[in-house]
């Protein structure tokens, strides 16, 4: 449902088909999750080192999953450094930070660390933190109204436009500032987890990343139906499924 031009802008599409497969969003989300699990209680330097290691290791193992050009270069550097990106890659992979955090301060701090290893532009960090904040609020019982208010107040995102207002002129963009507010809006308008995914895709943008951001918040708010979990798991490699199961066991 994602093309360079003329993206699909409706909600009535098959959620899965025989060609469905995971993308870079899945790979990097699992890499971040493993890094954070492996470094619980350690200092920032250790966490960042683990993030770089896991992201490079998994990224190199799954090379053709839709990474950005600059990120591909970073994956293969011997001494990688952040490259001042404000792309939406920082927000698509951040969910583990919100899931592990014991309070909002920790959620924001972990989100910042996960972004900074590549996306150290202020907008790249903000996108990751806004996503983590919305997810943390969702999983700790906040209402949609409270989530909207917090995100608008703390991050300055304009969440006033509806999806119907966003959709006509929206297109494939990869910046945090043009992806994260739209993804959060899709969650705010959703009726359940599946509807959240469909709404995000229907905007017609960077579909997998929109759905990754919207879906992470929706999972925390609604939970995920078991049939959808099963459909996703069977499309993972044994290695990635093992990482997912380990994450679910240790984060529970």
Regions found by a protein language model. Give the residues of each.
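Structured, active/binding-site neighborhoods that engage oxygen-rich ligands
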Residues: 1-252
């Amino acid at each position: 449902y994602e093309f360079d031009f003329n993206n699909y802008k409706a909600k009535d599409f098959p959620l899965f088909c025989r060609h469905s497969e995971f993308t870079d969003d899945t790979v990097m989300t699992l890499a971040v999750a493993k890094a954070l699990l492996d470094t619980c209680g350690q200092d920032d330097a250790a966490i960042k080192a683990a993030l770089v290691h896991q992201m490079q290791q998994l990224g190199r193992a799954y090379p053709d999953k839709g990474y950005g050009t600059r990120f591909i270069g970073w994956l293969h550097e011997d001494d990688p450094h952040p490259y001042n990106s404000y792309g939406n890659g920082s927000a698509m992979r951040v969910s583990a930070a919100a899931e592990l955090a014991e309070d909002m301060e920790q959620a924001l701090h972990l989100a910042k660390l996960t972004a900074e290893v590549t996306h150290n532009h202020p907008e790249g960090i903000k996108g990751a933190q806004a996503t983590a904040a919305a997810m943390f609020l969702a999983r700790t019982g906040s209402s949609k109204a409270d989530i909207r208010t917090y995100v608008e107040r703390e991050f300055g995102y304009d969440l006033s436009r509806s999806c119907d207002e966003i959709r006509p002129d929206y297109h494939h963009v990869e910046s945090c500032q043009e992806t994260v507010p739209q993804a959060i809006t899709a969650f705010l308008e959703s009726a359940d987890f599946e509807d959240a995914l469909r709404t995000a895709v229907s905007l017609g943008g960077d579909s997998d990343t929109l759905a990754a951001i919207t879906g992470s918040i929706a999972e925390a708010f609604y939970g995920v139906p078991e049939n959808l979990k099963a459909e996703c798991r069977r499309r993972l490699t044994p290695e990635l499924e093992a990482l997912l199961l380990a994450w679910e066991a240790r984060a529970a």
